[in-house]
């Protein structure tokens, strides 16, 4: 599955690394010039060791949000409503967008936003899925797997 992760802070890096470890192709959008390649490779190695798996996922760091294509998209930017809305408004698509927020109401972020909240640290085997907008059962099954 192809996945977009919006935001390269602590949780964004962790979520990206987790999906790569699970064998997915991840586009990680960042709005900074931080060099992430080595950081992500280190995180992926840690998760491979923790979960005792080594799937062949990959990641691509994207600086231009307009280049992201419609895929499962997880927003992980800072817990600031204005910033979340601004980032999401720059996407060229409006479906299959999930937020990792833990403190902002999904309805305040946007009409089409669902929740996909990962715990910290990412190795905690618990994910909160909040369904607000209809999405396909196929996508739901992929999320659960």
Task: Set out the residue ranges of the language-model regions.
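Conserved RecA-like P-loop NTPase ATPase core
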Residues: 11, 73, 120
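Rossmann-fold dinucleotide-binding core
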Residues: 77, 96-145
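Nucleotide donor/acceptor-binding cores
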Residues: 1-3, 71, 127
């Amino acid at each position: 599955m192809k996945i977009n992760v919006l935001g390269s802070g602590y949780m964004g890096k962790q979520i990206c690394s987790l999906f790569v470890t699970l064998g997915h192709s991840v586009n990680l959008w960042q709005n900074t010039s931080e060099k992430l390649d080595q950081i992500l490779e280190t995180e992926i190695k840690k998760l491979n060791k923790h979960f005792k798996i080594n799937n062949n996922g990959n990641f691509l760091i994207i600086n231009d949000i307009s280049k992201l294509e419609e895929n499962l998209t997880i927003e992980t930017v800072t817990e600031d409503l204005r910033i979340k809305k601004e980032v999401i408004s720059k996407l060229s698509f409006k479906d299959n967008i999930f937020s990792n927020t833990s403190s902002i109401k999904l309805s305040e972020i946007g009409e089409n936003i669902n929740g996909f909240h990962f715990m910290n640290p990412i190795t905690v085997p618990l994910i909160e899925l909040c369904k607000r907008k209809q999405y396909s059962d196929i996508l739901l099954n992929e999320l659960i797997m």
